[in-house]
Amino acid sequence: MATLNPFDLLDDDAEDPSQLAVAIEKIDKSKKSGQVSSLPAKSAPKLPSKPLPPAQAVREARSDAPRGGGGRGGFNRGRGGYNRDDGNNGYSGGYTKPSGEGDVSKSSYERRGGGGAPRGSFRGEGGGPGGGRRGGFSNEGGDGERPRRAFERRSGTGRGSDFKRDGSGRGNWGTPGEEIAAETEAVAGVETEKDVGEKPAVDDVAADANKEDTVVEEKEPEDKEMTLDEYEKILEEKKKALQSLTTSERKVDTKVFESMQQLSNKKSNDEIFIKLGSDKDKRKDDKEEKAKKAVSINEFLKPAEGGNYYRGGRGGRGRGGRGRGGVSSGESGGYRNEAAPAIGDAAQFPSLGGK
């Protein structure tokens, strides 16, 4: 008899004891039914000879439980959801619509998703309450497959707005059948050329030999040779021809100038030169006179008629004194009626170094 590990039951502290009791009762019922069925005829179906121990039965039930709604994070926040039997609903996929015969992919999605929705499925595709692990609530009639997006996130650089010309029809490159037909025609043409070219091989060799002979004959022209005397004669003839042309071209017809008359110029060249020289002399004299005219400074220093002569002076040094040369009181400088200084007076303008 096999020995059982008494410590296996320690892992089931979080389980509901009522669920364990129900599981044990089911195992006992299966034992009784197995004993009763062994007595009648052999036509009865065979049941397992040895029932599983309660700890192993609970472990298998836990392993078959769904990952989603019926599993962790159900409505009861426990590991078993509502109840292990109710959570499984007689099927390892939890609250899901049982798949048809042979639908292996669908059952695998349901088992993985728990509530009928596959892992990572989108909303509107799966089973009932509890939802998938990542899918949320979903419908029972969903296929369990990820829907194809209308616009995939792909780079559009280098792509225009035109359609690719892959198909056949007007405005396209053509069908693959046409290319195959063209290739077959080209292969057939090459084969026919080979057949035709193999037969007249001898004729081609003879024709090539004749061509080579003609080419050799054409490449050997005779060089033109002449002596030195002949060359000098040719040069003399060329010189004579050139001299005859030059003498004929240099002849001038004097008959054309006989009808022409000489016109007399009234003004002689000497008179013209004299006038030009006199104009230049006048301009020089005018410049010299302007430079020699002396202008006295008194003309610039004289005030206007009826004006006062201004002599600059210092302003008063009192509080808030006015600017230099302004109107002030006392003996300070201001506007006075004084005569202009005489430049010729030696007292006013003494010469430097004078005695």
Curated annotation (Swiss-Prot):
Domain FF per the UniProt entry, residue ranges: 234-289
Region listing for Disordered, in residue ranges: 26-225, 277-355
Induction text: By abscisic acid (ABA), and osmotic stress (e.g. polyethylene glycol PEG). Slight transient repression by salt (NaCl).
SMART domains: HABP4_PAI-RBP1
GO process terms (BP): abscisic acid-activated signaling pathway; cellular response to osmotic stress; cellular response to salt stress; regulation of abscisic acid-activated signaling pathway; regulation of translation; response to abscisic acid; response to osmotic stress; response to salt stress
Modified residues (Phosphoserine): 268, 351
Biased composition (Gly residues): 67-81, 114-141, 323-333
N-acetylalanine: modified positions: 2
GO cellular component: cytoplasm; cytosol; nucleus; perinuclear region of cytoplasm
Motif (Nuclear localization signal): 132-139
Assigned keywords, A-Z: Abscisic acid signaling pathway, Acetylation, Cytoplasm, Nucleus, Phosphoprotein, RNA-binding, Translation regulation
Low complexity composition bias: residue spans: 37-47, 177-190
Entry's localization field: Cytoplasm, Perinuclear region; Nucleus
Predominant location: cytoplasm
Tissue: Expressed in seedlings, leaves, roots, inflorescences, and siliques. Constitutively expressed in seedlings and roots.
Function summary: Ribosome-binding protein that acts as a regulator of mRNA translation by promoting ribosome inactivation. Binds RNA. Regulates responses to abscisic acid (ABA). Promotes stomata closure in drought conditions. Involved in resistance to salt and drought stresses via the accumulation of Pro.
UniProt similarity note: Belongs to the SERBP1-HABP4 family.
Protein name: RGG repeats nuclear RNA binding protein A
Organism expressing this protein natively: Arabidopsis thaliana
Lineage: Eukaryota, Viridiplantae, Streptophyta, Embryophyta, Tracheophyta
Name of the gene: RGGA
